[in-house]
Amino acid sequence: MTKPILYLDMDGVVVDFPETIEEIDQSIRVECREWCEKNSKHHSDFEGLFATLKPMKGAIEAIEKLREDFEILLLSSAPWNNIESWSHKRRWVGKYLPQLGKKRLILSHRKDLNRGDYLVDDRSRNGAIEFGNYEGQEWINFGSDHYPNWESVVAHLKNSLR
């Protein structure tokens, strides 16, 4: 039997992505703030940011539980002007999720073009809502009232198998 395909967004879902500069790792905070002030860009475009980020609470454990029943791929977007973040995301996966195996990372600004069963994403952008509009596909809005944490997502996905 083929396992259902489960796409996981990285930023804010698997990776604890900072919403503000104050939440950025102390080792690069000052440099990032100065860069943002000079370039009037968002901190997500700052080169080197992604390499300092840690996993979201409960994410690694949840992925381990879900691997038994789902074909898991990471489906993330990356800042277009921060090419370094693309390779940093790949390195992050190798560091924190080696158990997923190779070639499990897809970078796209059109998540709705991918076919699968589930997409866990904290934002509605980049085709997340549209992904859920296709028959047999579901967008799970991570961090929402229905799915506030990994525990609720795992429970929902495991129940969907019944």
Task: Describe the role of every protein-language-model region.
Residues 83-111:
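Active-site donor-binding segments of glycosyltransferases and PAPS-dependent sulfotransferases
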Residues 54, 59-87, 93:
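Substrate-recognition element of Asp-dependent hydrolases with the DxDx(T/V) motif
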Residues 1-47, 148:
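Active-site neighborhood of HAD-like aspartate-dependent phosphohydrolases
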Residues 5, 103-131:
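Conserved Lys-Pro-Asp/Glu-containing loop-to-beta segment of HAD-superfamily phosphomonoesterases
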Residues 15-17, 23, 74, 81-85, ...:
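Short catalytic/ligand-binding loop motif for oxyanion handling, primarily in non-cytosolic enzymes
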Residues 118-158:
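Acidic, Mg2+-coordinating phosphoryl-transfer loop and its flanking beta/alpha structural elements
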